[in-house]
Amino acid sequence: MADVPKREVENVEFVFEVMGSPGEGIDAVDLGDALRALNLNPTLALIEKLGGTKKRNEKKIKLDEFLPIYSQVKKEKEQGCYEDFIECLKLYDKEENGTMMLAELQHALLALGESLDDEQVETLFADCMDPEDDEGFIPYSQFVQRLMSDPVVFD
């Protein structure tokens, strides 16, 4: 099965169970979310290249089609890692004390690179952000740690 270890196949099956319809697979618009739920960080360009779509109900991806995609993304070198994100955010750390302005982080997420929309940023901040201090600064390393931590599975 696309050189994916049994335990990882079980994780993929669980994601398909949660995100898809039995026997039909997942909607191709959810390809990126499925990969991220499996602790991968594919770019939007890679998701599109691998068959992700922008509109719902255009295409379904079955488990046997997804496993080679999962395997390929696991091997992909263009995924951000913790150190990459920290190096990027250090550019905003003018005092070199591990903090940056919340407004600058929000601007970066909304306007730079593969930008997010307002709702995505609000969700991200609610899930991963420490409160800003009186001057509007936040500790960015904890933010990145939470952002990249394994997803919590609720029973």
Swiss-Prot record:
Q: What is this protein called?
A: Myosin light chain alkali
PROSITE patterns from the entry? EF_HAND_2
Subunit info?
Myosin is a hexamer of 2 heavy chains and 4 light chains.
Q: Where is the EF-hand domain?
A: 7-41, 80-115
- Coiled coil, from the record: none
Alphabetical keyword list = Motor protein, Muscle protein, Myosin, Repeat
User: Which terms in the GO cellular component ontology are assigned?
Assistant: muscle myosin complex
Q: Which GO terms describe its molecular function?
A: calcium ion binding
One of this protein's GO BP terms? mesoderm development
Question: Mind telling me which Gene3D superfamilies this protein's record contains?
Answer: EF-hand
